[in-house]
Amino acid sequence: MIKTYPHNIFKILAAIILLGVIAAGYISWQRYNVEAHATTVEMVYDYNNILESASVESTSADELFSLYKRSGITSLAVYDETPKKLADHGYIAVYHGSELISHMSNPLIRGNRIYIASTNTSEGIEYFDELKGQLKRLLRKDDFHIIHLNNEELLEINANYERFLNMPLGIFKTTVKKVEQTGLYIVLRPMNVPHATREDIDQFFSVVDSSGKISAILFQGKEALGYPAQLEYLLGGLKERHLPVVLIEAQNQLGFERQDGTLTLSNKDGYNTVRLYAMSKDELIKLDPKEAASRFYVSTIERNVRMNLFPSYKFAANGETLSETNARYIHDVTNRLEKHGFNIGKASVMEPYFPSRILRAASIAGAASLCVVAILLIVPFLVKYAWPIEVIVFLFTQTLYWTGYEAILRQALALGCAVGTPVIVMSLFMDYCVQKKQSAFKNIGWGHLFIEAVLLLWGCGILSLIGAIYISGILSDIRFFLEMNIFRGVKLTFILPLICVSLIYIQRFPFFGKVVVTDKDFIGFVKKFCQIDIKLGVLALISLLGIIGFIFIGRSGNNGAPVPSFEISLRRFLEDIMYARPREKEFLFGHPAILASLAALYHRWPQILHYFLVIAITIGQGSMVETFAHMRSPFILSLIRGIDGLVAGTAVMIIVLAGLIILTHITEFFRERYEKE
């Protein structure tokens, strides 16, 4: 217990922790300002999708551009052209040689060749001329010829017909100019060229320079354009034009989809990067428009996403056209983001933030002291060695920090704070329970119990949030904001506090008639615990704990157990009424357990029940702290999420209070009836 510390060492540890919190808090304030200045979200839709929809929806492309603008779309994604795309849009005509021979007899036509002609419209002529230049660059001289037939220019290609139709031709300037006329921004999606040369990169930048509306580069496929040989050359052009590279969030929300070269470009370009959320069409069709909108909304506010790439549904709904169905769910996302305080426009690029090394060092010193306090609470006999332990830990961590081992040190201390904070908070709570253990419920009453529980909840919650600031202060930099680096040990932050609090609990409260003070006591406790008779009720309780454990641990992370539909509905409701949706294990489970644990204490219910309730509280406090380990989530959102959880937990306490009153009256009724008999 803290009260058993030598007075001087406790004062010194408390002072170091306080100074560290101030430094970590200042770093977190700087982080908040960086995040607060990057609140513009770019909403992107596929340009070709609009053209294809216009051709089958009895409307014009201009009308659909207007529809999507009103829904919130700010930008159109432009991809590499292919011969098939150009032919489908009516810009060129593609013939197999054998097909052309059947219509005309000319010795110049060969049956094993492909022939391309312009459609003789103004757009067709432009596309044909640009296609001619692209094919000349991409094909061997022997495989590409220009011939004239009946005063008409034809392109003769020696290639497999089917494969040629889908051959990437690069992004066309003509397409970029057409998109520019819509007034929307343009997101270019180039594919890599096999054995790319500087000429290929120059060709791409000539397309970029043809418009002033290019907002970002979002590579298509598994490699960045120019990877690997021309990546440095591409980087120079991107820097010169101040164009951000877009990184696509991975489907499991950890890191990014593999695109070789993109992280290198981002690192070397000073993190001039935008984080993008994209949902596959296969995933979209499983969701109704409201749920799809919620996915995009949540990804933006919770994961520093500043660009959304919207897919199209396969089928229309509610008697609308497909475009209207798509525009409706996009409009829903736009409305919710604007209500949350975001702007819609060209994507914000976060400042490449790295805090002062002096501030970071102070945060590390405080975090190390916090970990020392947690260790002393778990292993009390080490208290007499507190001075040397603190000095050794301080010197060791500072040496690592200043000698180039910063990365692993920061990860270790962040994990230590995520585990140590709930351990310290729960130790204080258990000390309070020990002091109140002899109080009888008849001297307190339900009203007093509720007020006491609320005050304890908020006291514990505030202490947990203060400890959580250490995680933010230690990890804060642009690499963590963008999730190029991630916090390691999420599962441990759930499990270790439970183990540590259990060890402290048996030193505070008597299991099997006595508290654990010495190592012999602990061995005796383990032996008695292993000799407990397993009854049906105990087996049922263990099974229940197993289910709770599956939910608690299995649902953590990004690939956890499935979430039932009723819980999804609850989540969406909370997202609508709160700035940040709190976690269910906090406000439905951990926070109300404070009230139940006090009731168990004052009513002198079985010790095992009080223990499980303390474990439940630990889960709630640990969850509050662990929230801050998700560094891609804005600092203010994590902070308000914790506060919202305390508010919701207080409300749920009222329901728990009513349930406890009813349960107590029922048990008293049957007890009195049994005694009379």
Where is each model-derived feature located?
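Alpha-helical transmembrane segments of integral membrane proteins
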Residues: 2-23, 365-677
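Soluble extramembrane regions of membrane proteins in the secretory/endomembrane system
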Residues: 34-357
